[in-house]
């Protein structure tokens, strides 16, 4: 018997459902003789760098199933955190792929990669003792090894308990505190919403048709739904005929291979709803461009085909698995019992990464723009052939019925600036009777990207995150190929800060404020016209004058044109409100819902749902509140009063914080009256600048003040902290500009500085000086005299706000001209134009004086962009959070494709960049990438501090009780952001990317101390 000590490598197949391992596989290995002691030492170590298995890793992740395992094809244990096998000292290498824990047991085994030279499954033993007895000839070594193995098993058991607790904590985080069963129920509903919306609509139409045809019932349907129902059957049948030709190979059309991939009824519903949606929301209401409509419909069909194919594939895979299960009766009873448990787990958890699974398992290629356009065009053509409309029956019985097409296809010619040039494009125009019904269409429309019932899937890649099934992309690239490729190339680690921020924004739970919604519904049912709601009736057209006077008739025609334009705008607003209310009504009975977020190319975050979200108008913000309520506390009660004053506005928001509190307390009777009798009482809330948000706060504040303990009253209201002309705040911080910093509240003051009033005061000083000059020598003196009494903050506000976007002289002139025209102070058009030119010049001069550092930085950024773009390169940079940005401005080329409806002109990027656009757009885009970074940094810090957070670019929201914490965090993050050498890094990146180009030196910076921001109460307020 040899006494030489031989190291033993051990594979333990842990049974997750029992306390004991099912067996031990032992093979001799040639590594360290003190291997077991090293393992125990590493397992028990508390130093993170030395842990072999941290508390976040499954202790048996490295333990693969044997080759004869009954689970080999069905199951694989996975690590909660990907780890490198090379760090494992047990003699095993590369035993398998490590997957995230939230996908644990969620899909079949991906092939284990086992190095047969390093690991051999030769024989199994009933116990540790038997294994050691067979493998060792030294008695002392036997005892030593058994003791060490038992110690190892004890440590593994402890570690598994830790993992169980960790998984429970993670599950609670995943389900947002709603409980596992409730979460799964809501998740299944969410999957149905995303995957069955079109199918359910088609089913509803088929059931209505059955009621009409088979049971001789005429359903009492809303006007628009009756139109849909009338169009549905003939369109479905026409599509089915076309599909039959395609499937039999009788159609040689380019769209043939795509047209039969979806049931005809679903295609019919998608075509009707998408076209009507475009007619509602397009710029010219009642018409839609053919190319846009074709692409939108084609894209919707492709998305639904992918979901449909995946669901069909899933059904087949399930059937195959069920058959395999029936054939596996030879396995032991214990193994069968264990397999059933694993199968049940898989069933319960198979939806965990459903969005990613769809994209991972769907190996079909994207259709491309040409295919989408051809499919969409053919479906539009079929709708044109089958959709008709008949006016109400008010004709004489002897007259033939007036049945006419619901949609018309025509060509519109648009003249360009030069009379010799013009362009033509095809449009789809709906009949007047259809147009009148568009406003009532919203509540019957299928809206696929609804708010989610469960938290969005966490972002892990360009197209991995957001919705469960619906295609979701982390960035809105709008076809910009280089931008899309830049994001895809970026590593997950580089983008992790952005992903984490988007996950934070998406995890905020919202609900509908039913009391405010009921008030909106009452106003809307009464015809609108209150609280900034548009009039539901059109303005009457002026009567035609009974005269041959051409001057009077010309004036009448202009008035008719003006009223028609106003009515189109009213129609557009009514459609928009109907869509918002349709979503609010659908979600009003939900306990809560979530908005998945993504970013634009600059890194600004937006909710993916387009209609009812907190970035929207006052009506949206008024009906949205946090689903979680928190006690106000003393601080929260104070901030709720300040928030009410801010919403009332009208100059109140410019008072000190104490002044705003006093304003609210002085109007408590009005607040109570508004809460109790919003429409029957004095209607004080209607005087607010944001009336519906004001009403929501009136209701909440009334409940709190009237309660026995206002501080313990629960509040769901998001309280806003808004930046003061935030773009100029970022410029002042970049340039360390003391004068600019004081103007935009980067330093403390007794009350908030108003940059617009400051600029207006400077403009007035210049104009008063100019008014004293001799008009013969200075012609603008006359204009200065005419404008002296017109200068106020409203006149210059838009120009000051857009100055950070690089507003040009022409842009400023047009803005000021609109303000002057609204006031009617200057009647003559030529005099109005001259006055606007002069006022714009003076306003830009005042801006340059007050924000000299901002102007110099803006100029430097523009010069750098011009140098780069002159080399036919787009301007690129990386945001402080690691997001790669590529400006998308390239010259657009035309690509003609022939469809069954018409020849379509598709736009596509060329290789030639637009030098001027690259230069003028870079300064505002760069600043927006910085304000987006600040918001994301604040969002993540708030989540870690336990705050609910929502953001609207330069407006940060949280519960009233947490506003003080939010204020501290957002100031700290602003200072943290600008303490990094942002401009220096930008210049360095330019010089590295373009070593042969010469860039101008950085502009000089001032002496402003960034730490002053921490003590400024009105920086955000």
Curated annotation (Swiss-Prot):
PROSITE patterns: RNA_POL_PHAGE_1, RNA_POL_PHAGE_2. Its EC number is 2.7.7.6. GO terms for molecular function: DNA binding; DNA-directed RNA polymerase activity. It is found in: Plastid, Chloroplast; Mitochondrion. SMART domains: RPOL_N (SM01311). One of its GO terms (cellular component) is chloroplast. The active site is at residues 722, 797, 954. Pfam families: RNA_pol, RPOL_N. Residues 315-337 are annotated as: Disordered. It catalyses: RNA(n) + a ribonucleoside 5'-triphosphate = RNA(n+1) + diphosphate. Keywords: Chloroplast, DNA-directed RNA polymerase, Mitochondrion, Nucleotidyltransferase, Plastid, Transcription, Transferase, Transit peptide. GO terms for biological process: mitochondrial transcription. It comes from the Eukaryota. PANTHER family: DNA-DIRECTED RNA POLYMERASE, MITOCHONDRIAL (PTHR10102:SF0). Belongs to the phage and mitochondrial RNA polymerase family. DNA-dependent RNA polymerase catalyzes the transcription of DNA into RNA using the four ribonucleoside triphosphates as substrates. This is DNA-directed RNA polymerase 2B, chloroplastic/mitochondrial. It comes from Nicotiana tabacum. The lineage of its organism: Eukaryota, Viridiplantae, Streptophyta, Embryophyta, Tracheophyta.
């Amino acid at each position: 018997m040899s006494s030489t000590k031989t190291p033993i490598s051990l594979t333990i197949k842990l049974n997750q459902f029992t306390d004991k391992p099912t067996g031990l596989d032992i093979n001799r290995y040639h590594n360290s003789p003190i291997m077991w002691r090293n393992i125990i030492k590493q397992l028990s170590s508390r130093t993170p760098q030395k842990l072999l298995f941290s508390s976040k890793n499954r202790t048996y992740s490295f333990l693969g199933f044997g080759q004869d395992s009954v689970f080999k094809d069905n199951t694989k244990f996975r690590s909660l955190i990907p780890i490198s096998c090379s760090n494992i000292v047990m003699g095993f290498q590369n035993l398998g792929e490590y997957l995230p824990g939230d996908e644990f047991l969620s899909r079949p085994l991906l092939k284990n990669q086992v190095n047969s030279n390093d690991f051999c499954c030769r024989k199994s033993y009933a116990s540790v003792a038997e294994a050691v007895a067979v493998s060792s000839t030294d008695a002392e070594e036997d005892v030593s090894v058994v003791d060490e193995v038992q110690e190892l098993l004890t440590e593994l058991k402890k570690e598994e308990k830790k993992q169980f607790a960790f998984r429970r904590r993670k599950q609670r985080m995943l389900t947002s505190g709603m409980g596992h069963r409730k979460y799964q129920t809501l998740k299944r509903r969410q999957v149905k919403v995303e995957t069955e919306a079109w199918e359910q609509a088609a089913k509803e139409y088929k059931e209505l048709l059955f009621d009409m045809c088979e049971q001789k019932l005429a359903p009492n349907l809303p006007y628009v739904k009756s139109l849909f129902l009338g169009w549905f059957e003939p369109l479905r049948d026409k599509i089915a005929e076309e599909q039959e030709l395609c499937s039999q190979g009788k159609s040689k059309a380019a769209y043939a291979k795509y047209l039969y991939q979806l049931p005809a009824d679903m295609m019919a519903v998608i075509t009707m709803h998408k076209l009507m949606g475009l007619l509602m929301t397009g710029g010219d209401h009642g018409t839609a461009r053919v190319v846009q409509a074709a692409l939108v419909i084609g894209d919707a069909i492709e998305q639904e085909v992918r979901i449909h194919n995946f669901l069909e594939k899933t059904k087949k895979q399930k059937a195959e698995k069920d058959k395999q299960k029936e054939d596996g009766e030879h396995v032991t009873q214990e193994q069968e019992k264990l397999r059933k448990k694993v199968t049940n787990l898989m069933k319960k958890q198979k939806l965990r990464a459903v969005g990613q699974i769809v994209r991972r398992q769907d190996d079909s290629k994207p259709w491309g723009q040409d295919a989408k356009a051809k499919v969409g065009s053919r479906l539009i053509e079929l709708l044109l052939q089958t959709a008709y409309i008949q006016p109400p029956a008010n004709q004489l019985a002897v007259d033939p019925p007036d049945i006419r097409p619901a949609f018309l296809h025509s060509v519109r010619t648009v003249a360009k600036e030069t009379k010799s040039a013009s362009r033509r494009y095809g449009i789809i125009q709906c009949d007047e009777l259809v147009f009148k019904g568009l406003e009532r269409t919203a509540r019957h429309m299928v809206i696929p990207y609804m708010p989610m019932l469960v938290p969005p899937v966490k972002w892990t890649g360009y197209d991995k995150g957001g919705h469960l099934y619906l295609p979701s992309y982390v960035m809105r690239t709008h076809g910009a190929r280089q931008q899309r490729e830049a994001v895809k190339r970026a590593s997950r680690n580089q983008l992790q800060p952005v992903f984490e921020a988007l996950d934070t924004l998406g995890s905020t739970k919202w609900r509908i404020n039913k009391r405010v919604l009921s008030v909106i519904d009452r106003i809307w049912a009464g015809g609108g016209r209150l609280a900034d709601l548009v009039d539901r009736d059109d303005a009457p057209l002026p009567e035609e004058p009974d005269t041959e006077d051409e001057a009077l008739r010309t004036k009448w025609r202009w008035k008719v044109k003006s009223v028609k334009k106003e009515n189109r705008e009213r129609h557009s607003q009514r459609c928009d409100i109907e869509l918002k209310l349709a979503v609010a009504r659908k979600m009003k009975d939900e306990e809560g819902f979530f908005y998945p977020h993504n970013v634009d190319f600059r890194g600004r975050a937006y909710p993916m749902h387009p209609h009812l979200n907190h970035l929207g108008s006052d009506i949206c913000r008024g009906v949205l509140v946090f689903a979680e309520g928190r006690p106000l506390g003393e601080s929260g009660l104070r901030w709720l009063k300040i928030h009410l004053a801010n919403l009332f506005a009208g100059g109140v928001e410019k008072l000190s914080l104490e002044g705003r509190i006093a304003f609210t307390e002085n109007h408590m009777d009005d607040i109570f009256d508004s809460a109790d009798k919003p429409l029957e009482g004095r209607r004080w809330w209607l005087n607010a600048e944001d009336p519906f948000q004001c009403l929501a706060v009136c209701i909440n504040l009334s409940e709190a003040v009237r309660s026995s303990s206002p501080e313990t009253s629960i509040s769901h209201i998001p309280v806003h902290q808004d930046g003061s002309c935030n773009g100029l705040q970022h410029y002042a911080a970049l340039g360390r500009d003391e004068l600019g910093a004081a103007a935009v509240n980067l330093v403390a003051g007794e009350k908030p500085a108003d940059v617009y009033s400051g600029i207006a005061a400077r403009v007035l000083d210049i104009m008063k000086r100019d008014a004293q000059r001799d008009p013969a020598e200075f012609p603008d003196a006359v204009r200065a005299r005419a404008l002296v009494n017109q200068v106020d903050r409203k006149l210059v506000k838009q120009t000051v706000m857009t100055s950070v976007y690089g507003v040009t002289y022409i842009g400023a002139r047009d803005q000021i001209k609109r303000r002057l025209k609204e006031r009617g102070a200057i009647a003559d058009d030529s005099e109005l134009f001259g006055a606007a030119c002069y006022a714009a010049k003076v306003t830009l001069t005042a801006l340059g004086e007050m924000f000299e550092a901002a102007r110099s930085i803006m100029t430097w950024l523009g010069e750098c962009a011009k140098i780069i773009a002159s080399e036919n390169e787009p301007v690129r940079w990386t945001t402080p959070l690691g997001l790669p940005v590529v400006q998308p401005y390239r010259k657009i080329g035309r690509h003609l494709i022939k469809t069954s409806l018409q020849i379509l002109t598709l736009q596509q990027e060329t290789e030639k960049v637009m030098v001027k656009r690259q230069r003028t757009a870079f300064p505002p885009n760069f600043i927006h990438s910085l304000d987006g970074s600040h918001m994301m940094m604040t969002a993540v810090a708030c989540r870690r501090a336990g705050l609910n957070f929502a953001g609207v670019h330069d407006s940060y929201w949280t519960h009233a009780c947490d506003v003080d914490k939010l204020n501290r965090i957002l100031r700290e993050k602003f200072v943290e952001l600008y303490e990094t050498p942002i401009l220096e890094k930008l210049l360095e990146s330019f010089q590295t990317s373009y070593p042969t180009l010469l860039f101008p030196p950085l502009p000089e910076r001032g002496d402003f101390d960034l730490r002053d921001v921490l003590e400024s109460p009105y920086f955000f307020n």
